[in-house]
């Protein structure tokens, strides 16, 4: 996703019909708040730059990344799209793999069931340093990328 955005800035022009009336949900994992807050700030910045009103950005906080799909599902009747933001850092057990698989499957299932764009802004890294590099560091901010993705999908959906 990010390499596409960096290489193709002309593709970032997103033409939304009546963007000031579109409500977008952002579900944020409370685990690793030093990462997820920066992801949220990046996503919110992109939405505001694309004329989504601040009062139409609905934030829902959940305990961890595993709860992101349920948080997204709760928002689907109130919004036109959802951005899921979280951070899972690999440890010494298989827990990482189970969480990453469950979250990615859950998010796509919510999207397909609700027929709404739901973006996957969950960092899955080996270290905290890698997560920091992807939440405003040298590898950009994946919260921004997730917001661009959901806006682009909204534009495609409304053609």
Question: What does each model-identified segment do?
Answer:
Residues 10-16, 114-130:
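Mobile beta-alpha loop/short-helix "lid" or hinge segments that flank ligand
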Residues 12-59:
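Glycine-rich phosphate/diphosphate-binding loop of Rossmann-like nucleotide-binding domains
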Residues 31, 62, 87-88, 123-127:
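Short, ordered loop/turn segments at secondary-structure junctions
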Residues 50-77:
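Active-site rim loops that border cofactor/substrate pockets in soluble metabolic enzymes
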Residues 67, 71-107:
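Glycine-rich phosphate-binding loop
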Residues 97-124:
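Short, acidic/small-residue loops that bind anionic groups at enzyme active sites
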Residues 126-140:
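Phosphate-binding/catalytic loops
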Residues 140-159:
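A charged, well-structured terminal subsegment
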């Amino acid at each position: 996703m990010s390499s596409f955005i960096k290489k193709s800035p002309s593709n970032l022009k997103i033409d939304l019909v009546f963007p000031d009336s579109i409500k977008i949900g952002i579900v944020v994992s409370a685990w690793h708040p030093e990462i997820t807050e920066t992801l949220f700030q990046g996503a919110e910045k992109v939405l505001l730059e694309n004329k989504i009103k601040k009062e139409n950005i609905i934030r829902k906080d959940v305990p961890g990344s595993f709860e992101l799909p349920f948080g997204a599902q709760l928002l689907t009747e109130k919004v036109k799209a959802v951005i899921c933001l979280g951070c899972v850092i690999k440890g010494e057990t298989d827990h990482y793999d189970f969480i990453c698989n469950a979250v990615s499957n859950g998010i796509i299932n919510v999207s397909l069931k609700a027929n709404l764009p739901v973006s996957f802004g969950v960092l899955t890294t080996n270290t905290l340093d890698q997560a920091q590099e992807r939440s405003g560091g040298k590898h950009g901010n994946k919260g921004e990328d997730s917001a661009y993705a959901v806006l682009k999908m909204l534009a495609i959906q409304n053609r």
